[in-house]
Amino acid sequence: MRSLVVCLLLAACALECTARLQNVTVKGVAVCNKKRLANVEVQLYEKDTLDPDDLLDTKKTDAEGEFSVYGEEDETHAIAPYLLITHSCNPSKPNCVRIGRYLVPEDKIGGTYDMTYVTLDIKVHGEKEKCQ
């Protein structure tokens, strides 16, 4: 039993030693019906397989609808970042918000992903709606 614990500790240390710090910046402009949208929540997450996804950064769009989020994570494999954008552009019912998920391309890791205009009036695959 003791040797099993030692082996597990050594394996955990080996994984930690091979982890490397990776980062990404994502920027863009939130628009709804061709108008820039202020005060939209933009969250940058990093997908994990075995444990809950890591929230790396949260920002609100400014008065011009612009946002920029940055995150970094130590991982043994390539990070899998994505954005959750929560907004009230064309919900199906009053008092509801839409939550869209946007994947960050793998080739943008270590740099900046400029989404330019994020058209929130167009529904994205897997989008959710939350009503109060």
Swiss-Prot record:
Q: Which organism is it from?
A: Caenorhabditis elegans
Q: Which domain of life is it from?
A: Eukaryota
Q: What is this protein called?
A: Transthyretin-like protein 16
UniProt keyword annotations, A-Z: Glycoprotein, Secreted, Signal
InterPro entries associated with the record: Transthyretin-like (IPR001534), Transthyretin-like_sf (IPR038479)
- Asked if the record carries the keyword Secreted, the reply is yes
One GO location term (cellular component)? extracellular region
Please give the start and end residues of each transmembrane region: none
Signal sequence interval, chain numbering: 1-19
Q: Which residues are glycosylated?
A: N23
* Disulphide-bridged cysteine pairs: none
| Protein family membership | Belongs to the nematode transthyretin-like family.
**What Pfam families does the record point to?**
TTR-52 (PF01060)
Keyword Glycoprotein, does the record have it?
Answer: yes
- Could you tell me where this protein is found in the cell? Secreted
